[in-house]
Design a protein with these regions (language model features):
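ASCE RecA-like P-loop NTPase motor cores
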Residues: 1-213
Length: 213
């Protein structure tokens, strides 16, 4: 059952795309280690090799979000810029994310039968890093088919945020939702257009079986 179903298309577009921000990276890195203070899980565990990689990532991420707007042609005064092709820039971030994933994996194995709480947190943080790396690779290479890519300055600090979204969500929802679930109920006062559901049905990929009740 989906309430406020008139928002499904926009919500799906947001969740099926990419959003990478400096603050998102910083929040994740801070949970691992803040180099200046030594705070974070890796500081608590005294995990030297992984901590060194995180320290390098702090600098590399800062460089990345300075370079991406330049490579995309987003001027300081611009609020948004569509990215129409893969970006020609060099960044250490993708390689460092892969390096960190390996080091966190090794650390998880080292802690076996010792500290399950820390191991669980490490697995969670490692998964976030893998997801961030996958989204960054996809954005820089524009490897997601039928997506639009853009950079947008957000917040009081006007930090550049990397976005992508599928051009149409209907094929994705048709395969992942309506084609898999026997019954889907969409409730909203504004689904029908002129008393008919064709427009909503086509936009969401609900198929001809969609009925108005």
């Amino acid at each position: 059952v989906m309430d406020e179903a008139h928002t499904v298309e926009d919500t799906a577009s947001e969740h099926l795309g990419i959003r990478l921000s400096p603050l998102g990276f910083e929040h994740w890195l801070r949970r691992l280690l803040t180099p200046d203070t030594g705070k974070g899980l890796l500081g608590y565990l005294r995990a030297g090799p992984a901590a060194q990689t995180v320290a390098r990532l702090w600098d590399a991420v800062a460089d990345l979000f300075r370079e991406v707007p330049r490579a995309a042609g987003l001027a300081a005064r611009d609020g948004q810029k569509t990215v129409t092709g893969p970006l020609a820039l060099e960044s250490e971030v993708p390689d460092l994310l892969r390096e960190l994933s390996g080091r966190l994996g090794a650390l998880i194995e080292e802690l076996e039968d010792q500290d399950e709480e820390s191991r669980s947190e490490l697995r969670h943080l490692r998964g976030i890093g893998v997801a961030l790396g996958g989204m960054l690779d996809a954005f820089l290479a524009q490897s997601l088919p039928d997506h639009v890519y853009w950079i947008e300055r957000e917040g009081k600090r006007r930090q550049p945020v990397l976005h992508s979204a599928p051009i149409e969500v209907a094929p994705i929802l048709r395969e992942a939702l309506f084609g898999q679930v026997k019954s889907v109920i969409l409730t909203s006062a504004t689904l029908a257009v002129g008393g008919r559901l064709e427009y909503c049905r086509d936009r969401l990929g609900a198929g001809e079986e969609c009925e108005l009740l």
